[in-house]
């Protein structure tokens, strides 16, 4: 069972980095004696002239090229905890994830039985020794704020580093009466706060991606290539490449061209030699494209220059600021990430990512990695109780009560209550925010009400059941008519990509058939 790892949220990564500090001293000397750094934001000479007729490998690393094991130490000088500010972008209204975003911000959507989406980038930061983190949002931020304050509190990383995880909601002022207009605009509106921090770089992250990444190696590559901006890049085959914004690089790994979801000849023109970024020859032939992950390291003074001086009206990093920086001659470098990554922007992607953690023998994404745990709110719930149930290929969260039912290839969230005779297949149950007492259930029964959870003899297949849903007895949620798209909000559910999603706090009377 996936148990919360947040009981001592600061200690695992803080102790590890403290223990590694001695072994890093010799490497710090090598970094200190590297090539002289040019002023940030000043355009460097062209890559052709710098190459001088020879090909130079950039200092860019991927998980395949450089091991993430403890034997491969990453040594930043100065340390990431004091020199890097993490900025997580909460995204827009989350219309593609609706109705999961009806009552919550997108980063607050539950994930993997015990967690929320925001726990992924925050945990990646903490495991990478980045302990100063802001989360920017403007829609339904109450539950996100509550989760972050309970999960991470203050003094993340210890009193020495004075770490924090803080939500910054969009606000109107006499100087700026507008809400966030995009990713770059969101950062611009809070530049006055970010520039007060004595850091070298800003790490820009998305709040709706599922992946595990060592940001210290990302930042190390940024510093060692003397870049103004470094963009995390994902290798792609031709089939997937048409759905992403692609980048073209020169022989040093420097980004020279962008194309948004290209097709045909334009797609062919974006092919690159991915061995430059660390892929072996076989993988490079399979993956001849690189896509932007929407993750950036941007030097502090470069960020200030770009958002205030060069592109004061730009709203988006990916389509405006980053290509613009390339056009004015800044050094924009690619950093290859060759691991599992999923943009959880749609109901279908969210559904597949959750069920992917049940995959055998190795899940798409594992919550059981001791070297880089995923932290979350400590809830102090009892162990789950399973009574005469048949549970296969599933993940069960904390505090569940499961009685004489069948569960297969499903994810069952916190405090889920599943009654006798129920069949749950290929589904995601998000659970509940609270327990109902036996007295509450008795009173509900006397009034003809339905308790939170899954009633007796229900059959649920290929569905998402949001929190606190009340599903009566003998309900079938199996998409009997194979409907692909339907908006039945007044009835308590939506269907997107053939997946039935029951809305948070919805009530489905006994005998309902969907």
From Swiss-Prot:
A GO molecular-function annotation: glucose-1-phosphate adenylyltransferase activity
Comp. bias intervals (Low complexity): 41-52
EC number: 2.7.7.27
Span of chain positions assigned to the transit peptide in the UniProt entry: 1-64
Highest taxon, organism lineage: Eukaryota
InterPro entries: ADP-Glc_PPase, ADP_Glu_pyroP_CS, NTP_transferase_dom, Nucleotide-diphossugar_trans, Trimer_LpxA-like_sf
Tissue specificity as recorded in UniProt: Expressed in leaves.
Pfam families associated with the record: LbH_GLGC, NTP_transferase
Reported phenotype of the disruption mutant: Shrunken seed endosperm due to a strong reduction in starch synthesis.
Gene Ontology BP term (one): starch biosynthetic process
Keyword terms: Allosteric enzyme, Amyloplast, ATP-binding, Chloroplast, Cytoplasm, Nucleotide-binding, Nucleotidyltransferase, Plastid, Starch biosynthesis, Transferase, Transit peptide
Pathway linked to the protein: Glycan biosynthesis; starch biosynthesis
Class of the enzyme per the UniProt entry, highest EC level: transferase
Role played: Involved in synthesis of starch. Catalyzes the synthesis of ADP-glucose, a molecule that serves as an activated glycosyl donor for alpha-1,4-glucan synthesis. The chloroplastic isoform 1 is essential for starch synthesis in leaf chloroplasts and the cytosolic isoform 2 for synthesis in seed endosperm.
Record's subunit section: Heterotetramer composed of two small and two large subunits.
Protein name: Glucose-1-phosphate adenylyltransferase small subunit 2, chloroplastic/amyloplastic/cytosolic
